[in-house]
Amino acid sequence: MLLEFTKMHGLGNDFMVVDLISQRAYLDTATIQRLADRHFGVGFDQLLIVEPPDVPEADFKYRIFNADGSEVEQCGNGVRCFARFVHERHLTNKTNITVQTKAGIVKPELGQNGWVRVNMGYPKFLPNEIPFVADEPEALYTLELANDQNISIDVVNMGNPHAVTIVPDVLTADVAGIGPQVESHKRFPERINAGFMQVIDDKHVRLRVFERCVGETLACGTGACAAAVSGMRRGLLANSVEVELAGGKLQIEWQEGDVVWMTGPTTHVYDGRLDLRYFQG
């Protein structure tokens, strides 16, 4: 069968977006892995699926699958692309959209020239909300790594879980070495996304993220939210912060006790069609 799709990216975090309202397809783990292959498939960080919602307050249901086929709760760069996709495909004429995710409701607002502002919901900090193994909640935690190395982290759930550590320079940070250790650490029973943040000043940070089940990506929207919120909680950052990632910049806004707002661009790369039989086992 032929499957129509769209390739998009948010700051280099790239997606295959599939409308399963107007067409039908069964995409199992093995099929997703084959589609994600950058040599023999479409190639992407995540597959984004558009489905009818299960709850009356939502316009759409948004499902996210990593390149290894695992389903995850949230993707900040993805939800911006999702919002642009459903609008450009005329699945809705709304510019303010309510989207059901595995982590709850998010509300993207379409702006001009592909920019989207998203209500990302409330950040969560308690160990059982991450989840993270800890005796009691603390502002910062010490994580023991290999070779008697320790790092100080904050933990934030932005629809998916993040550990944030502050580094002197993101360019020289050992993301490839430390990232996998944090991601699969025994204190994170569902694994974790590891963020490495450099504070430039109170309105500007640089960030690299080693994503759970993916590895380091050019950008991570929920990671940018988690890092900014972590810095604000520590008293290092103002309530509106520019987060600079390898793929570009996001603006993150947060007030204590309120929702987090993320604003950033989207890019429509191309529309495609493929014979799904070649990717199924």
Curated annotation (Swiss-Prot):
Reaction catalysis annotation: (2S,6S)-2,6-diaminopimelate = meso-2,6-diaminopimelate
Subcellular localization, as worded in the UniProt entry: Cytoplasm
GO molecular function: diaminopimelate epimerase activity
Keywords for this protein: Amino-acid biosynthesis, Cytoplasm, Isomerase, Lysine biosynthesis
Recorded metabolic or biological pathway in which this protein acts: Amino-acid biosynthesis; L-lysine biosynthesis via DAP pathway; DL-2,6-diaminopimelate from LL-2,6-diaminopimelate: step 1/1
Site (Important for dimerization): 270
Pfam families per UniProt: DAP_epimerase
UniProt-listed Enzyme Commission number(s): 5.1.1.7
Domain of life the protein comes from: Bacteria
A GO CC term assigned to this protein in UniProt: cytosol
EC class (word): isomerase
InterPro entries reported for this sequence: DAP_epimerase_AS, DAP_epimerase_DapF
Residues reported to bind substrate: 13, 46, 66, 76-77, 160, 193, 211-212, 221-222
Active-site annotation: 75 (proton donor), 220 (proton acceptor)
Single Gene Ontology BP annotation: lysine biosynthetic process via diaminopimelate
UniProt-annotated site: Could be important to modulate the pK values of the two catalytic cysteine residues, residues: 162, 211
Sequence similarity: Belongs to the diaminopimelate epimerase family.
Functional description taken from the UniProt entry: Catalyzes the stereoinversion of LL-2,6-diaminopimelate (L,L-DAP) to meso-diaminopimelate (meso-DAP), a precursor of L-lysine and an essential component of the bacterial peptidoglycan.
PANTHER family tied to this protein: DIAMINOPIMELATE EPIMERASE, DIAMINOPIMELATE EPIMERASE, CHLOROPLASTIC
NCBIfam families: DapF (TIGR00652)
Subunit structure as annotated in this protein's UniProt entry: Homodimer.
Protein name: Diaminopimelate epimerase
Species of the source: Acinetobacter baumannii (strain SDF)
Taxonomic lineage: Bacteria, Pseudomonadati, Pseudomonadota, Gammaproteobacteria, Moraxellales
